[in-house]
Protein backbone atom coordinates (compact mmCIF):
# COMPACT_ATOMS: atom_id res chain seq x y z
CA UNK A 1 0.00 0.00 0.00
CA UNK A 2 1.05 3.54 -0.73
CA UNK A 3 -0.67 6.82 0.12
CA UNK A 4 -1.08 9.55 -2.47
CA UNK A 5 -3.01 12.56 -1.28
CA UNK A 6 -5.60 11.19 1.09
CA UNK A 7 -6.14 7.91 -0.80
CA UNK A 8 -4.65 4.46 -0.29
CA UNK A 9 -3.30 2.84 -3.45
CA UNK A 10 -2.36 -0.81 -3.96
CA UNK A 11 1.20 -1.22 -5.11
CA UNK A 12 3.32 0.11 -6.60
CA UNK A 13 3.79 -2.86 -8.91
CA UNK A 14 6.46 -3.28 -11.61
CA UNK A 15 4.61 -2.44 -14.80
CA UNK A 16 5.47 -5.54 -16.90
CA UNK A 17 4.44 -7.85 -14.03
CA UNK A 18 1.32 -5.92 -12.99
CA UNK A 19 -1.99 -7.81 -13.03
CA UNK A 20 -4.56 -5.02 -13.23
CA UNK A 21 -7.79 -5.41 -11.26
CA UNK A 22 -11.10 -5.63 -13.08
CA UNK A 23 -12.47 -2.58 -11.34
CA UNK A 24 -13.06 1.10 -11.87
CA UNK A 25 -10.68 3.46 -10.14
CA UNK A 26 -7.63 5.67 -10.15
CA UNK A 27 -4.11 4.77 -11.18
CA UNK A 28 -0.69 6.34 -10.80
CA UNK A 29 2.29 5.70 -13.04
CA UNK A 30 5.44 5.98 -10.94
CA UNK A 31 9.22 5.92 -11.23
CA UNK A 32 11.69 5.12 -8.44
CA UNK A 33 13.06 7.97 -6.37
CA UNK A 34 16.61 8.42 -5.17
CA UNK A 35 16.03 6.68 -1.86
CA UNK A 36 15.07 3.06 -1.34
CA UNK A 37 11.30 2.51 -1.55
CA UNK A 38 10.65 6.11 -2.62
CA UNK A 39 8.51 6.65 -5.72
CA UNK A 40 7.53 9.68 -7.78
CA UNK A 41 4.19 9.81 -9.58
CA UNK A 42 4.63 11.01 -13.14
CA UNK A 43 1.01 10.51 -14.21
CA UNK A 44 -2.41 10.11 -12.63
CA UNK A 45 -5.44 8.76 -14.43
CA UNK A 46 -8.85 7.21 -13.91
CA UNK A 47 -10.69 4.47 -15.76
CA UNK A 48 -14.00 2.65 -15.72
CA UNK A 49 -11.98 -0.58 -16.00
CA UNK A 50 -8.36 -0.66 -14.85
CA UNK A 51 -7.81 -3.98 -16.66
CA UNK A 52 -8.10 -2.45 -20.15
CA UNK A 53 -5.06 -3.90 -21.96
CA UNK A 54 -3.69 -0.61 -23.29
CA UNK A 55 -4.29 1.52 -20.19
CA UNK A 56 -0.56 2.10 -19.63
CA UNK A 57 1.23 1.15 -22.86
CA UNK A 58 -1.43 2.78 -25.03
CA UNK A 59 -1.08 6.16 -23.34
CA UNK A 60 0.52 8.84 -25.58
CA UNK A 61 2.91 9.69 -22.72
CA UNK A 62 4.23 6.12 -22.40
CA UNK A 63 7.45 6.92 -24.31
CA UNK A 64 8.12 9.88 -22.03
CA UNK A 65 7.61 7.71 -18.95
CA UNK A 66 10.10 5.19 -20.32
CA UNK A 67 12.59 8.02 -20.86
CA UNK A 68 12.23 9.00 -17.21
CA UNK A 69 12.38 5.40 -15.96
CA UNK A 70 15.16 4.21 -18.27
CA UNK A 71 13.42 0.87 -18.81
CA UNK A 72 9.94 -0.55 -18.38
CA UNK A 73 11.29 -2.50 -15.39
CA UNK A 74 11.67 0.84 -13.58
CA UNK A 75 8.08 1.87 -14.38
CA UNK A 76 5.58 1.16 -11.61
CA UNK A 77 1.79 1.29 -11.34
CA UNK A 78 -0.33 1.85 -8.25
CA UNK A 79 -4.14 1.62 -8.22
CA UNK A 80 -6.99 2.80 -6.05
CA UNK A 81 -10.06 0.70 -6.76
CA UNK A 82 -13.36 2.58 -6.56
CA UNK A 83 -16.09 -0.04 -6.87
CA UNK A 84 -19.58 1.25 -7.66
CA UNK A 85 -18.21 4.74 -8.32
CA UNK A 86 -19.62 7.06 -10.94
CA UNK A 87 -17.57 8.79 -13.61
CA UNK A 88 -18.07 12.05 -11.71
CA UNK A 89 -16.74 10.56 -8.47
CA UNK A 90 -13.64 9.21 -10.22
CA UNK A 91 -13.04 12.53 -11.98
CA UNK A 92 -13.35 14.42 -8.67
CA UNK A 93 -10.86 12.06 -7.00
CA UNK A 94 -8.55 12.43 -10.01
CA UNK A 95 -8.67 16.24 -9.75
CA UNK A 96 -7.76 15.97 -6.04
CA UNK A 97 -4.59 14.11 -7.05
CA UNK A 98 -3.66 16.74 -9.62
CA UNK A 99 -3.38 19.45 -6.97
CA UNK A 100 -0.77 17.55 -4.94
CA UNK A 101 2.44 19.53 -4.53
CA UNK A 102 4.91 18.97 -7.34
CA UNK A 103 8.32 17.56 -6.60
CA UNK A 104 11.48 19.05 -8.00
CA UNK A 105 12.55 15.81 -9.63
CA UNK A 106 10.09 14.05 -11.86
CA UNK A 107 6.44 14.36 -11.12
CA UNK A 108 3.42 15.51 -9.24
CA UNK A 109 3.74 13.57 -6.03
CA UNK A 110 6.07 11.30 -4.17
CA UNK A 111 5.42 8.59 -1.69
CA UNK A 112 7.44 6.23 0.42
CA UNK A 113 6.52 2.69 1.41
Give the positions of each predicted feature.
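Coupling/hinge elements of helicase-like and P-loop NTPase modules
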Residues: 103-111
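Generic hydrophobic, helix-prone segments enriched in Leu/Val/Ile
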Residues: 9, 42, 62-69, 104
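Acidic, metal/cofactor-coordinating or nucleic-acid-engaging core segments within structured domains
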Residues: 67-80, 85-104
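A broadly used, surface-exposed interaction patch
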Residues: 52-72
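GIY-YIG nuclease catalytic motif and its immediate N-terminal context
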Residues: 1-56, 84-99, 111-113
Amino acid sequence: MITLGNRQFSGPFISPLWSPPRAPGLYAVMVPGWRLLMFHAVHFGHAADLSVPELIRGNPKYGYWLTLAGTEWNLYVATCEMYQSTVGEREAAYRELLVLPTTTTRGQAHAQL
